[in-house]
């Protein structure tokens, strides 16, 4: 079992003001063209439009769930599960706003112990969930259990061990990278561990889609990222408010001067029962 300061790991225990920071980050990131393209690419590769019943684990505000529902070729049913009732309510609200409320269902639940009958879904998606899990192996076992024969899964997340934001001082850059990573994820190397974990859970890896989001000069995608990270790091107890504010100020100033550098590698794993 992992022990972590990661606020995303305990969204069922966060106060509403912190959950609003999480929700805003999920929506801003999810709507950015770079992130939306990665989602669309792996949904295409898993042939999501042909699936009758799809489960979105750790759905958050429903970014991936709604993206599937909006696809012109998708005619199936969708269920999103998240640990936080606050985020589930946000997901329902966004779905109604996009006139998708009759096509999607959102429920509160723990991905480690799903209250779902075995063999219920043709596809299971875990979009930006695995880096926040206490026990990835247990969640993989649940994904395998609720998947129908011939079904498909997709796991998409950041390889957060690769995430970096450059400051003027190299040593401080490394220190702050480590602190920020510790404050926003539970397992920064989980995507590197998936090949053996998927095999152990009874899955064969069908496809791996790597992508990298790097911004040089000016922060766009990463602007909302560093702003939210600076708010969450003190909550995690990894940095003080002053340290977080100074880090953010330096990065935004670098962006204003055209000197920003921020990067992270992402992977989508598509698997099927072995």
Model-derived features: where do they sit?
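C-terminal helical/coil "lid" or tail adjacent to the Rossmann-like core of SAM-dependent
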Residues: 2-25, 29, 206-262
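Conserved alpha-helix/loop element of class I SAM-dependent methyltransferases that forms part
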Residues: 32-50, 67
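Class I SAM-dependent methyltransferase SAM/SAH-binding core
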Residues: 55-57, 61-113
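A short acidic, Gly/Pro-enriched loop at the edge of an enzyme's catalytic core
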Residues: 112-123
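A short SAM/SAH-binding and catalytic strip from SAM-dependent methyltransferases
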Residues: 122-135
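A short glycine-rich, Lys/Arg-flanked "PGG" loop and its adjoining helix->strand segment in the class I
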Residues: 137-152
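Conserved catalytic/acceptor-binding region of the Class I
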Residues: 152-219
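Core SAM-dependent methyltransferase catalytic element
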Residues: 201-203, 266-274
């Amino acid at each position: 079992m992992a022990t972590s300061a990661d606020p995303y790991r305990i969204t069922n225990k966060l106060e509403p003001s912190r959950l609003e920071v999480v929700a805003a980050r999920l929506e801003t990131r999810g709507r950015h063209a770079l992130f939306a393209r990665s989602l669309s690419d792996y949904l295409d590769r898993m042939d999501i439009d042909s699936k009758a019943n799809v489960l979105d684990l750790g759905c958050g505000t429903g970014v991936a769930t709604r993206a599937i529902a909006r696809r012109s070729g998708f005619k199936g049913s969708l269920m999103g599960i998240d640990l936080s009732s606050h985020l589930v309510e946000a997901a329902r609200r966004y779905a109604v706003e996009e006139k998708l409320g009759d096509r999607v269902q959102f429920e509160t639940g723990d991905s480690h112990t799903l209250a779902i009958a075995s063999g219920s879904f043709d596809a299971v998606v875990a979009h930006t969930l695995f880096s926040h899990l206490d026990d990835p192996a247990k969640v993989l076992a649940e994904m395998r259990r609720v998947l129908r024969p011939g079904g498909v899964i997709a796991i998409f997340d950041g390889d957060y061990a690769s995430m970096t934001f450059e400051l003027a001082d190299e040593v401080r850059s490394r220190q702050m990278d480590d602190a920020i990573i510790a404050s926003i994820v539970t397992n920064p190397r989980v995507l590197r561990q998936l090949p053996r974990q998927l095999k152990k859970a009874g899955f064969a890896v069908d496809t791996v889609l790597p992508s990298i989001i790097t911004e040089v000069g000016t922060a766009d995608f990463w602007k909302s990222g560093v702003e939210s990270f600076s708010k969450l790091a003190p909550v995690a107890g990894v940095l003080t408010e002053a340290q977080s504010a100074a880090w953010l100020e330096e990065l935004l100033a670098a962006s204003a001067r055209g000197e920003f550098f921020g990067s992270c590698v992402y992977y989508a794993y598509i698997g099927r029962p072995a």
